[in-house]
Amino acid sequence: ERKNWNLLFAGLAFWGMDWFNEIWNGLIFHFNAYAPVWGAPGKTAYLILIGLNIEICFMFAVAGISFGKLLPADKKLRIMGIPNRLLLAVINSVFCVFVEVLLNRVGALTWDYAWWGAKAPWLIFLIGYLPFFLVSFWVHDMDSVRKKVLTVGTILGVDLAALLIFGAFLQWI
């Protein structure tokens, strides 16, 4: 779709939110020297951070746009009495947690803590995905491209600053 700024910025917001999570995950590993909250083991074309490889990075870039395409045009539409953006954020988050459980079962994603895994999926839901969707859909619905640029620019700017400070300068991640 040409000039669909809503989808483009929703996708960038989703992707930027993932980068933030990947950065703090790397910091967890740095500070505890035991394990990250999640890890990306195995073969990859390029491991970016301990829980993020290039394949996952591209998946999150595409996912934000793909999930944005599911949004009804009517922002105020309610489904079963629930605002559609909230309901879709919850449903999509549950779906993503389910996919992560499958990836963990085949060894493509590691979890080393009892509080983050298939037996305790609520944190993956609440921290790992729900904020991604809520922010992505919020950006999607902003009434001007300027607001979208400022919001996504802030998200990506925080990510870049954290990567420079904790990665390039301190070499913690």
Give each language-model segment a name:
Residues 1-173:
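Aromatic-rich, lipid-facing transmembrane alpha helices and their immediate juxtamembrane interface loops
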